[in-house]
């Protein structure tokens, strides 16, 4: 079904539907919800809405401080970076939101329409969908962690570094007995070859930001072993340092656990 929507929206900027999207963008930017749209919780610097029937997302990038405006002149606006970074991921065979239409608003902000990506966040999968202790659920959880490790390893092996690789920014859906993953919120992504170890560490810390009560060391090591197999240029010592340090630093940053890492 999603492929049908992607095909439909590929040339939408040249169709009459584009005018409807621009009209919606103006309405949504003024906090008016057109029929079929629902507001989605987002950061203080964005406004997000979802149209389930049309499988579309709208994201408005609100204007920020003069310093951010200056940065946008040098690096490109957040909307532009989100669009280009998603396209770069898709070109490399890594799933991300497909862009539909983008533009500027009279207020000075920018907006971006994308096709809905199927799936639930890794947070949902680990904290809700795979918490039972029966054999079937345990196998599913192990499969999820192993295939997630392979996916993130492939992302890093191709030089991509996510701006905020939190479990909420990775969606997963199970299709034909395999998990398919997608990266969301790609505004701050970068690409470096070779990939600096400190940036790999930052991504791994972000991904480790789940309580050890919910995701134990065995789970984390299952992910890490699969991740490591995709980055053969890392020596065993480098890989061990990344595994240990990402876990320790994430543990220190978790609320109520400062100083508890051992």
Predicted segment positions?
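Hydrophobic residue at the +6 position relative to the catalytic HRD Asp in the kinase catalytic loop
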Residues: 165-172
